[in-house]
Amino acid sequence: MLDSIKIKLQYLLPKQGLTQLAGWGANKQGGWLTQLVIKAFARYYKVDMKEAQDPEFSAYRTFNEFFVRPLRAGVRPVVAEENLLAQPADGAISQLGAIREGQILQAKGHNYSLEALLAGNYLLAAEFQNGQFVTTYLAPRDYHRVHMPCDGVLREMIYVPGDLFSVNPLTAANVPNLFARNERVICIFDTAFGPMAQILVGATIVGSIETVWAGTITPPREGVIRRWTYPQAGCEGAITLEKGQEMGRFKLGSTVINLFAEGKVYFAPQLNSGAVTRMGEVLAEAVPTTPSY
């Protein structure tokens, strides 16, 4: 009964207005009030401040500064082998597996369209047909910077406006086409094993989505799809990111979806729905190397 009420509220609440209000408040320097909110949040969600570069709450002037706090050097070692992909974020696996007949598993009993996720771009969707996907959910307590699973050259970025439903497990299990209807930023990289998509999905009270090369992508929320293209590898202005390098962040947190082309990666066998992820640990092995787990 309670879960049903929570889902109905997702449809009824003014999500855009709540998100704007949360973003405004999270950027305010509220002195003692900001400190009170940060400490209450950390206590409620059991945030491990020992991992933070600066573990003192007083170091953070705004809630957003606290929320996107960097980690201490060395607490997230990145898997070194060239053929191994690293997990892009701290969180938990929502779902992972094969993209079948253009459909991606959202939750038990719920699929959504690959093409819809990619804003109706059928040419882009064709690059990932019959490929692999992994969805990583970042809970409020998690580290909220997103990193590269592998070396890659940025090909294009697409901002897709949309709803701002919560992306927690309850909502994922009950709101159809959740990730294809929410606001998102699609980043396409060319890698040594083919194309890779890294998609940052917005949600209720996610005040902004940022990337390291373009800064804040949203807000503003103008309600139109925006697309940027970038030079190829070796050309002037090409944007190359290394495995483990930060590529974006959420204020506040949300979900990351990775897409891979057909036959290009083997996910680590210990990963399944609900598995805890830590940025830098093994996500998958890239072909043509034979899996060696």
Swiss-Prot record:
Site positions for Cleavage (non-hydrolytic): G253, S254
Main location: membrane
InterPro entries documented for this protein: PS_Dcarbxylase, PSD-B, PSD_type1_pro
Bilayer topology term: Peripheral membrane protein
Bound cofactor: record note: Binds 1 pyruvoyl group covalently per subunit.
Post-translational modification summary for this protein: Is synthesized initially as an inactive proenzyme. Formation of the active enzyme involves a self-maturation process in which the active site pyruvoyl group is generated from an internal serine residue via an autocatalytic post-translational modification. Two non-identical subunits are generated from the proenzyme in this reaction, and the pyruvate is formed at the N-terminus of the alpha chain, which is derived from the carboxyl end of the proenzyme.
Annotated catalysed reactions: a 1,2-diacyl-sn-glycero-3-phospho-L-serine + H(+) = a 1,2-diacyl-sn-glycero-3-phosphoethanolamine + CO2
Biological processes per GO annotation: phosphatidylethanolamine biosynthetic process
Keyword Transport: no
Keywords, ordered alphabetically: Cell membrane, Decarboxylase, Lipid biosynthesis, Lipid metabolism, Lyase, Membrane, Phospholipid biosynthesis, Phospholipid metabolism, Pyruvate, Zymogen
Enzyme Commission no: 4.1.1.65
Cofactor needs: pyruvate
Modification sites for Pyruvic acid (Ser): S254
Pfam families in the record: PS_Dcarbxylase
One cellular component term from this protein's GO annotations in UniProt: plasma membrane
GO MF annotation list: phosphatidylserine decarboxylase activity
Subcellular location: Cell membrane
Function according to Swiss-Prot or TrEMBL: Catalyzes the formation of phosphatidylethanolamine (PtdEtn) from phosphatidylserine (PtdSer).
Stated family: Belongs to the phosphatidylserine decarboxylase family. PSD-B subfamily. Prokaryotic type I sub-subfamily.
UniProt-recorded name of the protein: Phosphatidylserine decarboxylase proenzyme
Source organism: Yersinia pestis
The organism's taxonomic lineage, starting at the top: Bacteria, Pseudomonadati, Pseudomonadota, Gammaproteobacteria, Enterobacterales
Protein encoded by which gene: psd
